[in-house]
Amino acid sequence: MSTTFGGERLIEWNVPVWEHSLEGGLRMLRLAIDTHIITSHFALPLLIQNEGGLVVEMTDGTAEYNAENYRLSLFYDLAKTSVIRLAWAQAKELAPHGCAAVALTPGWLRSEMMLDNFGVEEPNWRDALTVQPHFAISETPRYVGRAVADLAADPLVARFNGRSLSSGGLAKEYDFTDLDGSQPDAWRYLVEVQDASRPADATGYR
């Protein structure tokens, strides 16, 4: 699994490319793309020694969502969509060796950084809903971790080779839940509720 990024503090949201820090933007791309390619360059010779190997490229957003939605920064948009294409390209190269590659995205992740941004911790994360009501669809890191575990244990995982997957979608595929027993489907929620300017209500989406 390749999850390297660390470029969050370099993002300048809603700033056009000609005003965005070029140094920061290019650094973001190196963190998002170069690190994944370098990891694959050295790790895949080991992976292909046995059939059934799997590469999971972690990103933000499904291919479907990112194809229709600008991610509010040219550099961030490019960084996250490139990882999806990277998984697709690796899938082509790995298939002859009986191995697979997928791109996987969590939903609205309650990472430590996200919780810090809202001034909450995991036990009281719902307090953040007073600031951002749509945070109701968020999920723990364990949720996408369970998605990875089920993918890795699936003897038929090759059927997903080259695809863009999400924690919410795989929860339905493999019938796992987040820690609270729910199945957040963040990307469907973002399209149908948040982006549609509907009132925040996660009913039917988790």
Model-based region annotation:
Residues 4-7, 16-22, 51-96, 107-109, ...:
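Catalytic loop of short-chain dehydrogenase/reductase
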Residues 103, 123-206:
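C-terminal helical subdomain
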Residues 12-31:
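Active-site Tyr-X3-Lys motif and surrounding loop/helix of classical short-chain dehydrogenase/reductase
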Residues 27-51, 63, 91-92, 96:
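Amphipathic alpha-helical dimer-interface segment in Rossmann-like NAD(P)H-dependent oxidoreductases
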Residues 56, 97-102, 163:
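Rossmann-like NAD(H)/NADP(H) cofactor-binding core
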Residues 101, 105-109, 114-116, 146-150:
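Active-site/pore-lining binding-face segments in mid-to-C-terminal subdomains
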Residues 33-36, 78-87, 101, 144:
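Conserved catalytic Lys-bearing alpha helix of Rossmann-like short-chain dehydrogenase/reductases
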